[in-house]
């Protein structure tokens, strides 16, 4: 049986914390002139994974 491998794309996107997994929101790369400052400020904040997605993220991050 081969070793279980971590999904490297997911490993770069999610970080394990004591209270769950955090990630950076999308939508802050380009075409930002039409967005309000408040929206851009809120997109800068890190978010936590929803409870319904934790099982799938754990499966992707086998060793993390």
Swiss-Prot record:
GO biological process, one term: translation
GO terms under cellular component: cytosolic large ribosomal subunit
Gene3D superfamilies: 4.10.410.60
Keyword Ribonucleoprotein: yes
Pfam families associated with the record: Ribosomal_L35p
Molecular-function GO terms, alphabetical: structural constituent of ribosome
Coiled coil (UniProt feature): none
Keywords carried by this UniProt record: Ribonucleoprotein, Ribosomal protein
NCBIfam families, per the entry: rpmI_bact (TIGR00001)
Family (UniProt): Belongs to the bacterial ribosomal protein bL35 family.
Protein's name according to its UniProt entry: Large ribosomal subunit protein bL35
Annotated organism of origin: Colwellia psychrerythraea (strain 34H / ATCC BAA-681)
Taxon lineage: Bacteria, Pseudomonadati, Pseudomonadota, Gammaproteobacteria, Alteromonadales
């Amino acid at each position: 049986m081969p070793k279980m491998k971590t999904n490297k794309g997911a490993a770069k996107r999610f970080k394990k914390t004591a209270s769950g997994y955090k990630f950076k929101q999308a939508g802050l790369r380009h075409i930002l002139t039409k967005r309000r400052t408040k929206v851009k400020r809120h997109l800068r904040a890190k978010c936590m994974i929803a409870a319904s997605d934790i099982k799938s993220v754990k499966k992707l991050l086998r060793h993390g």
